[in-house]
């Protein structure tokens, strides 16, 4: 088994443990949604998850996807990313990280820059706010769109 598959399986097990601890029943659909989120690096929408899973789960609905994503979000194992186009995207990676977003195709890529972790502490110190979190996005054009000449 590849290291990536082992990592996905490990993260899935941890997520299932978090769901069980919260009293959430583990269903095949729930596991499939969670596995898709863990293995996807594209920050999918609920519709994208539905399109990917509906061939294997013909009885699954978009409402089921949204309901499960809400449960995952409430427990803290998924982040909802909202943007101006009114379509929420979902991110399994809930650790502090940032996003760079392609202005042409909408692709979102995670990146982490440790020095930015100090921003919250500095903001709290300078403003005397109780800082709870922050969000930073960088916009540009991805490699694929540059190559296509979009």
Swiss-Prot record:
Origin superkingdom: Bacteria
Residues where Zn(2+) binds: 102, 105, 142, 145
Keyword Ubl conjugation appears in the UniProt entry: no
A cellular component term, taken from the record's GO annotations: cytoplasm
Keywords: Cytoplasm, DNA-binding, Manganese, Metal-binding, Repressor, Transcription, Transcription regulation, Zinc
General function of this protein: Manganese-dependent repressor that controls a regulon of oxidative stress resistance and iron-storage proteins. May act as a hydrogen peroxide and organic hydroperoxide sensor.
Family listed: Belongs to the Fur family.
Protein name as annotated: Peroxide-responsive repressor PerR
Organism expressing this protein natively: Staphylococcus epidermidis (strain ATCC 35984 / DSM 28319 / BCRC 17069 / CCUG 31568 / BM 3577 / RP62A)
Organism taxonomic ancestry: Bacteria, Bacillati, Bacillota, Bacilli, Bacillales
Encoding gene per record: perR
């Amino acid at each position: 088994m590849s290291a990536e598959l082992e990592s996905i399986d490990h993260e899935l097990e941890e997520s299932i443990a978090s769901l069980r601890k919260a009293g959430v029943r583990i269903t095949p659909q729930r596991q499939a949604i969670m596995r898709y989120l863990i293995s996807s690096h594209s920050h999918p929408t609920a519709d994208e998850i539905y399109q990917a899973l509906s061939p294997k789960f013909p009885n699954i609905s978009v409402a089921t996807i949204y309901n499960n994503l809400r449960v995952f979000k409430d427990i803290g194992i998924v982040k909802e990313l909202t943007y101006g186009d009114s379509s929420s995207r979902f991110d399994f990676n809930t650790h502090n990280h940032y996003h760079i977003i392609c202005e042409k195709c909408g692709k979102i890529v995670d990146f982490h820059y440790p020095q930015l972790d100090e921003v919250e502490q500095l903001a709290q110190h300078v403003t005397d706010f109780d800082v709870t979190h922050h969000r930073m996005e960088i916009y540009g054009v991805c490699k694929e769109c540059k190559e296509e000449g979009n």
